């Protein structure tokens, strides 16, 4: 049975906007022209059947794949940015954790994030140390990333992406390999930073249990369109 869409809170204004955005895969139309602004300081769920184009949409918002229509952040479109500058605006957590690591060990990866975070006033060394501790990563710091379990790699990837501090954060199945306790820990870190930094967060998760109650709205991808789910409360 199709799960009931979560009731949404009133949407806040935002800076990442798309107008008449459409997507194709080969000759197949995935998304008909669509307009939306992602609200800042709120967490959204992007839901839909397998293969409908959810991951494709996130990649398009990062300008990693072609799209049709207009995409902008605070009125500036990606062609006006250096590609590196757009990457400092929109962060993406991929489904495959190992595709996203730059270093050999846990300690080196997190040190790289600490040096390069775009939100150093929030992601202080003390806050990053706390996040490492609650995720159980502190005791793994000397370890090779490639000796970690799938769940440990995903927690490291999650913290690395989160602590980079981009104002827009897109998460593709961030909790797929985690138990419920770890999911709740990640959600607490995500909510705290989202509210403090007024981050616009959109995540894909096939698992809804223990997740939807933390989210502010749901964006449903079906029939080649996107629509807000549920009733406003």
What are the residue ranges of the model-derived segments?
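Catalytic Walker B motif of ABC-type/P-loop ATPase nucleotide-binding domains
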Residues: 169-173
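Conserved ABC ATPase "signature" region
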Residues: 122-140
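Hydrophobic anchor residue at the start of the ABC signature
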Residues: 158
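Conserved ABC ATPase signature
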Residues: 144-148
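Helix-to-loop junction immediately C-terminal to a conserved catalytic motif
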Residues: 62
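The feature captures the beta-strand-to-loop junction immediately N-terminal to the Walker
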Residues: 47-49
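Conserved ABC transporter NBD signature motif
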Residues: 66-79, 86
């Amino acid at each position: 049975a199709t799960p009931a869409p979560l009731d949404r809170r009133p949407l806040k204004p935002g800076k990442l906007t798309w107008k008449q955005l459409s997507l194709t895969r080969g000759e197949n139309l995935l998304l008909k022209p669509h307009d939306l602004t992602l609200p800042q300081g709120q967490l959204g769920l992007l839901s839909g059947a397998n293969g409908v184009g959810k991951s494709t949409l996130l990649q398009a918002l990062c300008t990693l794949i072609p799209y049709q229509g207009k995409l902008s952040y605070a009125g500036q479109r990606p062609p006006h940015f250096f590609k590196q500058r757009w990457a400092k605006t929109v962060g993406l957590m991929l489904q495959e954790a190992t595709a996203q690591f730059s270093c050999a060990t846990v300690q080196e990866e997190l040190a790289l994030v600490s040096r390069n975070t775009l939100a150093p006033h929030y992601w202080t060394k003390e806050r990053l140390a706390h996040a490492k501790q609650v995720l159980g990563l502190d005791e793994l710091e000397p370890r090779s990333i490639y000796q970690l379990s799938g769940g440990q790699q995903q927690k490291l990837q999650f913290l690395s992406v989160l602590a980079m501090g981009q104002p827009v954060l897109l998460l593709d199945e961030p909790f797929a390999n985690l138990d419920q306790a770890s999911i709740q820990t990640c959600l607490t870190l995500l909510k705290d930073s989202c509210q403090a930094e007024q981050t616009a967060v959109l995540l894909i998760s096939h698992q809804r249990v223990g997740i939807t109650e933390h989210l502010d709205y749901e964006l449903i991808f079906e029939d080649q369109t996107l629509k807000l789910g549920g009733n406003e409360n």
